[in-house]
């Protein structure tokens, strides 16, 4: 299991990196806007900054929704840094663009995936990653983790190399459910990653150890 952090916040990326478990970063236009990063050039400089911190895969999303625009933007993004993975929406022109990028050796992340059919087309087109959105499916009372498990089974059955990148993860519980479902990657907020450390018995045990140490060393 690889851990990606889903943010454009450099401080959070550095903190996750310093923890020693970070494998990559996913971003999107909403996360860029949240950080107040405006303008194409500023956003691209930001992607390079992220790549310099992480030294792992960084998903950078195209804004265009037409084939020619996605291909143009994707090539420009991929040229920024070898760690860039071009993030492409799961629409008809997006699948065409992924096929093109695959032929050019440009890695891709097919995003906004909500069904096994979409995941199948992404894999057939040669996507490096496919991103099923767990939390957003849960929001409409569908089984997001179940979709992750279904995609994993399908890819294994047909030996597709596309990696399942579980996205829209809201909690530490989501992470562990996706681990059990066989996801290759979980991209999540820093709070969910750090939440994996939390257990009351760990806190109680550490407190007891320290108290006992003080008793014999006073």
From Swiss-Prot:
It holds the Pfam family TAL_FSA. It is found in: Cytoplasm. The keyword ATP-binding does not apply. PROSITE patterns: TRANSALDOLASE_1. Pathway: Carbohydrate degradation; pentose phosphate pathway; D-glyceraldehyde 3-phosphate and beta-D-fructose 6-phosphate from D-ribose 5-phosphate and D-xylulose 5-phosphate (non-oxidative stage): step 2/3. The keyword Nucleus does not apply. HAMAP family: Transaldolase_3b (MF_00494). NCBIfam families: fsa_talC_mipB. This is Probable transaldolase. The lineage of its organism: Bacteria, Pseudomonadati, Bacteroidota, Bacteroidia, Bacteroidales.
